[in-house]
Amino acid sequence: MTERFTGRLADVIRRPLITEKATRALEQNQYTFEVDHRAAKPDIKAAVEQLFDVKVTGISTMNPPRRSRRIGRFAGKRAQVKKAVVRLAEGNSIQLFPES
């Protein structure tokens, strides 16, 4: 059994993922984040609602497999990540790109 995330809510979300697919999903009011791999959906929902002051209507999570990495003769694995696609209620939005 995996360990449960017990840290602060601010530590759940690591960073927003800005990819072509994630940028297209912004039109449907869906935001993609890299989150702590131990965080469950209720943890992610609470963190997003508290940090960004929005209403979350749904969350989809993905645990992609860890990829191997080799540097010279040393082999290892990349850090484990978890992706979360968060759907917001109508009228809510998160400003990922600050106006300059």
From Swiss-Prot:
Subunit and partners: Part of the 50S ribosomal subunit. Contacts protein L29, and trigger factor when it is bound to the ribosome.
GO cellular component: ribonucleoprotein complex; ribosome
Pfam family, one: Ribosomal_L23
GO molecular function: rRNA binding; structural constituent of ribosome
Protein name: Large ribosomal subunit protein uL23
Superkingdom: Bacteria
Keywords from the named record: Ribonucleoprotein, Ribosomal protein, RNA-binding, rRNA-binding
Family the UniProt entry places it in: Belongs to the universal ribosomal protein uL23 family.
Organism of this sequence: Synechococcus sp. (strain CC9311)
Gene name as annotated: rplW
PROSITE patterns: RIBOSOMAL_L23 (PS00050)
Primary role: One of the early assembly proteins it binds 23S rRNA. One of the proteins that surrounds the polypeptide exit tunnel on the outside of the ribosome. Forms the main docking site for trigger factor binding to the ribosome.
GO biological process assignments: translation
